[in-house]
Amino acid sequence: MKDYLIKATVPGVRAFCTVTTESVAEAVTRHDCYPIAAAALGRTMTASLLLAANLKTDECITIRICGNGPLGEVVADAGANGIVRGTVRNPHIDLPLKNGKLDVGGAIGIGLISVTRFTGMKQPFTGSSHLVTGEIAEDLTNYLAWPGTSHSSNRRPGTARW
């Protein structure tokens, strides 16, 4: 199955859904990621594609998640053209399961999520917010809803679900 992105719009609402299995599998293989790093990288890559779906043709987005956990930094870039790439600083992290699930939040730790939008202008626009759980979907939702930066006008209220 190939990766794909579906866009739906009605007056006042935009929705995006994506399948990124092949892109994430390629990144996980290239970086030799253990399961927790694979989950964090895949979620971040998918989130960057979802945000990039709103961009103009020549624009791109970078999501940078910097936490104090053992995973370190997770970064993903995506363009409006659907091309995505990502990396994780420490791909060989292994933590015990938390409530039967991968502890991505524990691997990322406490820190910041930053989103940079490159528009072709001289200076990119960057906004950031504190990580809420480190599980990425909640952190992205908090970023989209948080009015605490000078570039909050670049944000559209939204939520992310896995």
Question: In which residue ranges do the predicted regions lie?
Answer:
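Interaction interfaces in information-processing and related assembly proteins
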Residues: 1-162
